[in-house]
Structure formats: structure tokens, C-alpha cells
UniProtKB/Swiss-Prot annotation:
This is Ocellatin-1. One of its GO terms (biological process) is defense response to bacterium. Has hemolytic activity against human erythrocytes and antibacterial activity against the Gram-negative bacterium E.coli. Belongs to the frog skin active peptide (FSAP) family. Ocellatin subfamily. It is found in: Secreted. Expressed by the skin dorsal glands. InterPro entries: Antimicrobial15. It comes from Leptodactylus ocellatus.
Length: 25
């Protein structure tokens, strides 16, 4: 459902942000 899609997108976004932060450190 829509909620599942949003949850999946949230995880992808979180992983993307964590990756960017890790690159800067």
C-alpha cells in the first residue's frame, strides 16, 4: 500500500543521507 511505499522511500532517503554524511566525515 501507500504506507509501505512511503516507509520504503523513507528508508532509502535515510540511507542516502547517512551515506552523504559518512562521505563528509
Amino acid at each position: 500500500g501507500v504506507v509501505d511505499i512511503l516507509k520504503g522511500a523513507g528508508k532509502d532517503l535515510l540511507a542516502h543521507l547517512v551515506g552523504k554524511i559518512s562521505e563528509k566525515v
